[in-house]
Amino acid sequence: MVMKKALLATLVVSGFMYGSFAYADTNTVAVGYAQSKVQDFKNIRGVNLHYRYEWDSPVSIIGSLTYMKGSESDSHKDNNSVEKGNADVKYYSLMAGPAYRINDYVSVYGLLGFAHSKIDVSINGTYLKKNGETVSHSANVNKKSTHIAYGAGVEVNPIQNLSLYAGYEGTSAKFNDNSHSINGFNIGIGYRF
C-alpha cells in the first residue's frame, strides 16, 4: 500500500515535470541541505532537491524531494546488567504545491505530499546472575510509518539565473502507537533557466 502511494505520487510529479519540459518558460533546479528534529530522537540530516516550473503567470508549480538519516546510541549499566542500544532513522518525503512570485526577486511556496520514515533499533545486553552465570540477550525492531507531509518557504532570485531557497518541512511518524513529530528546515541553491 505504501509503495503504491509513493509510486502514484512520483508519477503525478513526473507528469508535471514532463509537461514542464515540453512547454517550459522558466525552470529552476536546486539542491540543498536538509535537517530535522525527530521527537524523542536527535537531529537527522540529508539532502533536499527542488524543481520549479514557471509560465506566464505569478502562480507556478514546485516539487520537493528530501532524504535524511541519523543514528543514536545509548547504554545503561547497573550492578548486575549492561544494555547497549542503537537506533537508525531514515526519512524520505515527496511533495508538490503552488509557488507565488511576489516580484522579480522573491517568491513564496507551499508544499503537500507524503513522508516515509523507517526506524531500526537493536538492543544487546548481558545480565550477571547471583550464581556468577552470565546471560546475554538481544532484540531487533524495525518499524515503518507513512504520513502526510507539508512545507512552506521562500525563494529568492538575486540575479536572473540564481535561485536561493529556505523552507520548513514537517510531518509525524507513528511507531508502536506513539506519534513522533518531525520538524525541520532546508536551504539550498539552484540554477534558473
Regions found by a protein language model. Name each.
Residues D40-G46, E72-V82, D120-K130, F175-N183:
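Outer-membrane beta-barrel translocator domains and adjoining extracellular loop/strand segments
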Residues M1-T26:
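Cleavable N-terminal export/targeting peptides
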Residues D25, N43-V47, D88-Y92, K144-I148, ...:
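Residues that define the transmembrane beta-barrel architecture of outer-membrane proteins
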Residues Q35, Y53, P98-Y100, F114, ...:
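Residue-level signature of outer-membrane beta-barrel architecture
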